[in-house]
Amino acid sequence: RRVPLLLLGILFLASLSASFAISLREHNESQDNPFYFSSDNSWQTLFKNQYGHIRVLQRFDQRSERLQNLEDYRLVEFMSKPETLLLPQQADAEFLLVVRSGSALLALVKPGGTIIYSLKQQDTLKIPAGTIFFLINPENNEDLRIIKLAMTVNNPQIQDFFLSSTEAQQSYLYGFSKHILDASFNSPIEKINRLLFAEEGRQEGVIVNIGSDLIQELSRHAKSSSRKSLDHNSLDISNEWGNLTDIVYNSLDVLLTYVEIKEGGLFVPHYNSKAIVILVVEEGVAKVELVGPKREKESLELETYRADVSEGDVFVIPAAFPFAIKAISNVNFTSFGINANNNYRIFLTGKGGPTGKEDNIISAGINPDVLGLMFPGSGEDVQKLFNNQNLSHFVNGSYHKNAHPHEQEQQKQQKGRKGAFVY
């Protein structure tokens, strides 16, 4: 089973050539690119007022049959103005949240008591399903932006349950009969209606403005422990062209990754052995190239999916599909890897040498004699080519030397060949 995967990776390398368009079918950021979600038309606004908004990305499984394995996952964006509160709620989903910018006070109301976390940019936290929580932007001059991966418990939709009624949202308590309510609260229904459900005094929405005194009171009880951060103190990969930080949430089977690429840098061709990656652009502009097989009528061919991505865009990368990212400007993004346990990043190019973390898998793992059987060049020359890069993972994305005419002719001859086996 490894051979088709390896061949797919090798063929991806050819896609970076000058005559790329000749040998592979391409999809740009248009309607027929199932992996690209534009920030302009892929987000649905659930709530919006002068204090902030809540948006959810289009369902992955409704976008393409290729994304059916993501039917239980949704991406949620939250933004709030300074000194605001997202009213207490719970949901039939687990959340893994990342603070994109600003700071937050996040309160989790549990049977054993309430825990308030102080979160800064790039901090992450898991909210268990059914946990009542509320969220505060304590700053007086900076917006709070959060991205959440939601993992549903009751398929297929996710439902937020708010304790209180607003002009935009009804309290779920209101759904109970008066006999249930008066017995549960040990109070007459008139009092319950006046205190909980009266229209007078209702908030306009689920994001409201609050005073500095309440913020100071909650801040005194907040703690920063038991949360994880994607900050620079925990870098896993770093060089002059970029850096990467990973956090694995084993209980959720999710890999959370933060990547920064310098302008002109290239995140070299690689793939994830098992994880399906949901990439969310935080800042900057980049080009994404993804190569995968597609069945079209009775023929098989490789297809290239390209997109120029910027802030708010989302790109999904299926497991084992090779891809590369080139930074047009300084760019950073967060990604959620689904099926993360026992996942490996397989780099197809990069620094060669003895087997180790810095190596690409081709030069480190394939015998030169085998390389000679795989490619037109000699095994020794092919191995030297794969070892020619002096950096790993992040490299200079520009190479200006023109291809030799004979090399261009060889590239043209690749037209019409089939891609990976699909079965």
Swiss-Prot record:
User: Which CDD domains does the protein's record reference?
Assistant: cupin_7S_vicilin-like_C (cd02245), cupin_7S_vicilin-like_N (cd02244)
Gene that specifies this protein: PHS
- Name this protein carries in UniProt: Phaseolin
What is the recorded function of this protein according to its Swiss-Prot or TrEMBL entry?
Major seed storage protein.
Query: Domain Cupin type-1 spans what residues?
Result: 35-193, 228-383
Q: Does the keyword Amino-acid biosynthesis apply?
A: no
GO annotations of cellular component type: aleurone grain; vacuole
Region named Disordered: 397-423
Q: What is the lineage of its organism?
A: Eukaryota, Viridiplantae, Streptophyta, Embryophyta, Tracheophyta
Q: Where is the composition biased (Basic residues)?
A: 414-423
Where would I find glycosylation on this chain? 28, 243, 332, 390, 396
This protein's source sits in the domain of life called Eukaryota
Q: Where is the signal peptide?
A: 1-21
Q: Belongs to which family?
A: Belongs to the 7S seed storage protein family.
Q: Which UniProt keywords are present, listed alphabetically?
A: Glycoprotein, Seed storage protein, Signal, Storage protein, Vacuole
Source organism per entry reads Phaseolus lunatus (Lima bean)
Cellular compartment(s): Vacuole, Aleurone grain; Vacuole
According to the record's subunit comment, the protein's assembly and interactions are: Homotrimer.
Gene Ontology molecular function, alphabetical: nutrient reservoir activity
Its main localization is other
Manganese is among the record's keywords: no
**Matching InterPro entries, A to Z?**
Cupin_1, RmlC-like_jellyroll, RmlC_Cupin_sf, Seed_Storage-Functional
